[in-house]
């Protein structure tokens, strides 16, 4: 995920996955497909170098399919899974996690639910039991539910002065006016969420139908299979949850301004993107590096910041949800510089769209993107994130070991085809939150 737009989706989706498609390992990652005794499939990277185990799990179905009167219920349900389970109330559960020196968390995104577990090898059986009880026997007690709802209500007030929230809301409302992606929580929806709603949401989402599991670390295939059954074996077979329709972003709005009293303005700009199964996905990683994904080597950073000093930083990257895809960019600047920063950004995008990239730029991008992938695989936690991202995106099990070659195979013609397809500034909506001078 590029820094300004960390999107959960699957743990892979959006730019998180692009980062792992934009870089490549210098060492093989031995990913093995295992099947537990009860028939649940998982991907395993067995490595005893470090005495720890990392597990990631993902289920399709997130906040985009919530009932319209219960927006926010999926996220609250995810939070409540670690607020007491089985015989342990919220305090006892958290104390047990601390005693085991483990981490366990659940999260909800637009299109799915995720679980993350990290444990020392010596505590792994007890850690797997904690995950089992959280997933299968959550208490959904009244006190932590009331506390979480109070926190969310406070958040409703603070978000109205959060530039990122306001900008992304404006974008989603402009691009997806009648789609669930434009919905947000409200005081009414939070008030309506009760224990029964949490029970229903858990039952609707947690089953084996869309479950995807990745395990990395100090554990054998046999023990990993038993761990999978310990945690997930009691889940019903279930069915894939209903999904919202695919949506094409609405026609671009050249400029949307949201006034917010502050000395700086946040600028977001988005245009139509592509899904990660598109043949142009990997060339897009190279093209994006050239436009705005390559830090100080990118064209936008050079022209908008280095040459003119108009922004503190600027970057771009793909943003993929299950039912829509975008190219997103962001910048932050002084209110007096917003107009010129947008003009220069549009002009540089237009120049790239008209003239294309150079062979030298493509070579530099490929060198960086392939060379830096090792940094994405230098710990068990990172390996789990990368491999699980590919798994959730539907990649084959060997993808992590062959993506270097895919990146290196990208040609100048490939990159310029993507640039012509996706980087036309006339297709982008710009949103400004702040008090930009001369813009309304």
What are these regions (language model features)?
Residues 1-10:
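Bacterial N-terminal signal peptides
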Residues 17, 159-207, 228, 315, ...:
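Scaffold signal of the M16-like zinc-metallopeptidase fold and its non-catalytic homologs
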Residues 17-18, 181-182, 207, 212-275, ...:
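An aromatic/glycine/proline-enriched structural segment found at the starts
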Residues 17-24, 212-216, 331, 363-440:
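C-terminal regions of mature proteins
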Residues 55-121, 161, 180, 184, ...:
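M16/MPP (pitrilysin/insulinase) zinc-metallopeptidase core fold and M16-derived inactive scaffolds
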Residues 63, 268-272, 292-333:
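A structural supersecondary motif
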Residues 83-87, 118-149, 294-295, 315, ...:
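M16/insulysin-pitrilysin zinc metalloprotease superfamily fold
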Residues 151-169, 250-265, 306-311, 322, ...:
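Short acidic/His-enriched helical or mixed secondary-structure segments at domain edges of catalytic enzymes
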